[in-house]
Amino acid sequence: MENTDVDQPHSMGTTIIGVTYNGGVVLGADSRTSTGMYVANRASDKITQLTDNVYVCRSGSAADSQIVSDYVRYFLHQHTIQLGQPATVKVAANLTRLLSYNNKDRLQTGMIIGGWDKYEGGKIYGIPPGGTVLEQPFAIGGSGSSYLYGFFDQAWKEGMTQEEAEKLVVTAVSLAIARDGASGGVVRTVTINKDGATRKFYSGDSLQLWHEELEPVNSLLDVVFASSPVPMVS
């Protein structure tokens, strides 16, 4: 029987996250890329640099999100040359929105723009499929996001420190990896503030384990029977 899964487009499945904190933003993503039922790449990088202080998290079709990122990077470079100063995060978000909206019938991708500029500080913009742009204190996207809305409602708070924001992002991505079959691999993060951008990498064996992944704990009856293999009543 012919297997058509390998002929399907690369999909980033994906969990992508952007969080603001008191001083900047933290972006995070898993690393699994799928082709049909197959994992095409288990260590892909879904956080793409647009400028020195602006990055984009990509989900959906790998080809679509990559070509949009390439065009946005090119236009931002031209913008910087013409104006003599770096583009703001809002400009990057609006360019991404414009490309997504004008090609909404042909693109299958959702993105999160995050960065820092001297005018507005750290900003996060969510751009779902279709080309809407939403400024948010935090944004989540991709197939793993459906498992995270309740978690973020409880865990996110205004005015977090950098350490708290980084821990929140890594914990959230690891939770999505445990629940979502299309998310997996490692966790990559980018922290962006006035000092620039810092990338971090968290391997799969260093991530927090969740309920289904923990070793089963024996019940009290199991312990009793294990310590007394001979029946107490003959």
Curated annotation (Swiss-Prot):
This is Proteasome subunit beta type-6. Coiled coil: none annotated. It comes from Nicotiana tabacum. InterPro entries: Ntn_hydrolases_N, Pept_T1A_subB, Proteasome_bsu_CS, Proteasome_sua/b, Proteasome_suB-type. The 26S proteasome consists of a 20S proteasome core and two 19S regulatory subunits. The 20S proteasome core is composed of 28 subunits that are arranged in four stacked rings, resulting in a barrel-shaped structure. The two end rings are each formed by seven alpha subunits, and the two central rings are each formed by seven beta subunits. The catalytic chamber with the active sites is on the inside of the barrel. Its EC number is 3.4.25.1. Belongs to the peptidase T1B family. One of its GO terms (molecular function) is endopeptidase activity. The keyword Hydrolase applies. It is found in: Cytoplasm; Nucleus. GO terms for cellular component: cytosol; nucleus; proteasome core complex, beta-subunit complex. The active site is at 14 (nucleophile).
